[in-house]
Amino acid sequence: MTIHAYQEMYLSKAQASLGDAFDYAINTCKIPSEDFIRFFTASSVSKRMENGEPAFLAGKSGIEIAVDVVLETTGKQLDCEPQEHMGRSREYWIGWAVCYYQWYSARSFSDIFKVLSFEDLQNMYYTLHEADITKFADIVDDKMRDHFKETNLKRIRTIYGCTQAELSERSGVSLRSIQMYEQRNKDINKASVEALYRISKVLGCTIEDLLEK
């Protein structure tokens, strides 16, 4: 079971805010879509949303998030007048859906956008924007697995027949850390020797077996 960075009660607000941020930056301020994605993933804003910081989940509007992203990464102040829309834009849905998947999977926004280009997401919009969001998550999961092959830790753990939760309990290494090592959200090569030793003892392998080449 994936450990989420924040409670589900905050998810809808976070999704709406990121959707509004994408819509405002791309449609109102005319920032090229791939540029805004690059700004967002490079900014501290994306990391703070991943970590579940309340100020960025419920305390800021989408426009404020877009302004913070662009100011931090380019030094420019966005001051475009917000526009009224009759419905939710394609760009809104993209931000909204990606925010859900980040929460659901605990993967970084950076990793998600390494796999999904804006064009990919545009194409998914036409077939998925009226579907249940879990269908989007399932499709993206498949794409992520195809792109990020199994880590040595996951391969060895699976062969040993041990779940992530069992490995965490027996090794004393947090479940969240094990998940992040397996998803490559944390570099296992930079893990403490003690953590690597504990995991290796449980799985009956060497520390070197766990490291990524």
Walk through the language-model features, giving the residues of each.
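N-terminal interaction modules that seed assembly of large macromolecular complexes
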Residues: 8-68
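The alpha-helix within a helix-turn-helix
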Residues: 26, 157, 168, 200
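DNA major-groove recognition helix of helix-turn-helix/homeodomain DNA-binding modules
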Residues: 66-74, 193-209
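Conserved hydrophobic/aromatic packing and binding residues within compact polymer-binding modules
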Residues: 153, 167-168, 178-181, 210
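Recognition helix of helix-turn-helix/homeodomain-like DNA-binding domains
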Residues: 173-189
